[in-house]
UniProtKB/Swiss-Prot annotation:
Role description: Component of the cytochrome c oxidase, the last enzyme in the mitochondrial electron transport chain which drives oxidative phosphorylation. The respiratory chain contains 3 multisubunit complexes succinate dehydrogenase (complex II, CII), ubiquinol-cytochrome c oxidoreductase (cytochrome b-c1 complex, complex III, CIII) and cytochrome c oxidase (complex IV, CIV), that cooperate to transfer electrons derived from NADH and succinate to molecular oxygen, creating an electrochemical gradient over the inner membrane that drives transmembrane transport and the ATP synthase.
Modified residues (N6-succinyllysine): K4, K35
Protein name as catalogued: Cytochrome c oxidase subunit 4 isoform 1, mitochondrial
Keywords: Acetylation, Membrane, Mitochondrion, Mitochondrion inner membrane, Phosphoprotein, Transmembrane, Transmembrane helix
Self-association state and partner proteins as the record states: Component of the cytochrome c oxidase (complex IV, CIV), a multisubunit enzyme composed of 14 subunits. The complex is composed of a catalytic core of 3 subunits MT-CO1, MT-CO2 and MT-CO3, encoded in the mitochondrial DNA, and 11 supernumerary subunits COX4I, COX5A, COX5B, COX6A, COX6B, COX6C, COX7A, COX7B, COX7C, COX8 and NDUFA4, which are encoded in the nuclear genome.
Mitochondrial matrix side: 1-73
Keyword Repeat in annotation: no
GO biological process: mitochondrial electron transport, cytochrome c to oxygen
SUPFAM superfamilies: Mitochondrial cytochrome c oxidase subunit IV
Amino acid sequence: SVVKSEDFTLPAYVDRRDYPLPDVAHVKHLSASQKALKEKEKASWSSLSMDEKVELYRIKFKESFAEMNRRSNEWKTVVGTAMFFIGITALVIMWEKLY
């Protein structure tokens, strides 16, 4: 089987708060329903339902600003790892003092 690599000469999609409008859309290959929705988008937006507007947004963007600004739990991993190594160091020091 042949592995197809991505063409890195083309612009890539990225969610960033400091660069809010990426060069390309999040969804590159539209399904039939998404294509129909994109055609419906060309008409009046007042005829679109809220769910259709959200779906159009999700075609263009992966995350909203609220989702990008959401806190992560990465700090728990960092603190846990630091405490683990502090504990190992304490055990080594206690072992050295004992022997």
